[in-house]
């Protein structure tokens, strides 16, 4: 404590108030740092989310294009079979 010749009871309130103030300031400083870190982390996540993976996009495009082409082929084949009839043996006499 202080060695100024004052009694403990005279300085105890000031010392306690000073310690409490320092604790409060340290707590507020920690909270501010945590908020800043969270903001930085959120910003990094947003930056990462903005740029999609080009390779995956190209793969997805190719996949959808293949599926579309297959559906078209199946439709054409079904229409052709329908136009020709079932085929089979033909008429029996």
UniProtKB/Swiss-Prot annotation:
Which residue intervals make up region (Disordered)? 1-73
What factors induce this protein? By iron starvation.
Q: Which InterPro entries match?
A: LSO1/2
Q: Report which residue ranges the record marks as coiled coil.
A: 20-83
Question: Biological process (GO) annotations?
Answer: intracellular iron ion homeostasis
Q: Where in the cell is it found?
A: Nucleus; Cytoplasm
Chief subcellular location: nucleus
Tell me one Pfam family matched here: LSO1_2-like
Which superkingdom? Eukaryota
Q: Where is the composition biased (Basic and acidic residues)?
A: 25-49, 57-73
Gene Ontology cellular component list: cytoplasm; nucleus
Q: Which UniProt keywords apply?
A: Coiled coil, Cytoplasm, Nucleus
Inactivation phenotype: Mild slow-growth phenotype in response to reduced iron levels.
Q: What does this protein do?
A: Likely to play a role in iron homeostasis.
Protein name in UniProt: Protein LSO1
Organism per entry: Saccharomyces cerevisiae (strain ATCC 204508 / S288c)
Question: What phylogenetic lineage does the species belong to?
Answer: Eukaryota, Fungi, Dikarya, Ascomycota, Saccharomycotina
């Amino acid at each position: 404590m202080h060695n100024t010749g004052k009694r403990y009871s005279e300085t105890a309130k000031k010392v306690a108030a000073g310690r409490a103030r320092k604790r409060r300031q340290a707590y507020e400083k920690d909270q501010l740092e945590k908020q800043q870190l969270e903001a930085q982390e959120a910003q990094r996540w947003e930056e990462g989310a903005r740029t999609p993976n080009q390779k995956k996009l190209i793969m997805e495009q190719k996949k959808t294009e293949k599926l579309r082409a297959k559906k078209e082929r199946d439709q054409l084949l079904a229409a052709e079979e329908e136009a020709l009839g079932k085929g089979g043996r033909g008429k029996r006499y």
